[in-house]
Curated annotation (Swiss-Prot):
Binding-site list for substrate: 100, 107-110, 184
Entry note: cofactor: A monovalent cation. Ammonium or potassium.
Record-level Gene Ontology MF annotations: ATP binding; metal ion binding; pantothenate kinase activity
Gene: coaX
Subcellular location: Cytoplasm
Identification of the protein by name: Type III pantothenate kinase
GO biological process: coenzyme A biosynthetic process
Active site: 109 (proton acceptor)
Amino acid sequence: MLLAIDVGNTNIVLGIFAGHELKCHWRVASDRQKTADEYGLILRQLAHYQGLDLKEIQGVVLASVVPTLTQVLTEMITKQLGHQPLVIGPGVKTGMPIRFENPREVGADRIVNGVAVYELYGGPAIVVDFGTATTFDAISEKGEYLGGAIAPGIGIATDALFARAAKLPRVELVRPPRLIGKNTVACMQAGIMYGFIGQVEGIITRMQAEMGGKAIVVATGGLAGLIGPEVNCIDRVDPMLTLEGLRIVYERNT
């Protein structure tokens, strides 16, 4: 079995693959204060509840945008599983040409998403990853990573509105029943949700035009299930796209 780990600023997503099949996955908070031993305990508890034997894990692949957690999790994997993880970064074979001014600047998760979307859906394609930040990544018809855009995530926008407007309460991030709100909370939810949707649709539409025509648009990330269905120009919602990309890259390096 293969353990795939996607380390983000807010959450860590772990998945267990048996061949090409994703057997199970978990989402835990990204906590920079936790030690390797604490993360090891979490992994063992999750595996126990799932009825999995960690001794069956034959390889580990990891993509991270949090350097401190990369070190902690690498130590945890070495101690708990006896494996050296494949950490996505320079020198790792992805099979995807990077048409970026400085390829080392591209986040590991964005590269992995690009690999996955081209392998699973073909190109040209656009990946929208709804996480702490919202990233848009363009993949050519030939499978080249072309670049993209980075915008604040909807959670950041919500926190900023609450923090900077003294009389506005903190609200739950949910789809409002209508655009025209009838109370302060509903008005905030409508403005946050539909303002964000408009931003996403605008960036996708302009990106497609810059790419010369129609590109398949795939949404992923922790908030893809909430926001993806509301965006008219998103074709597919695939919350496990990053884990699939990690599996694909691992296979290309073994």
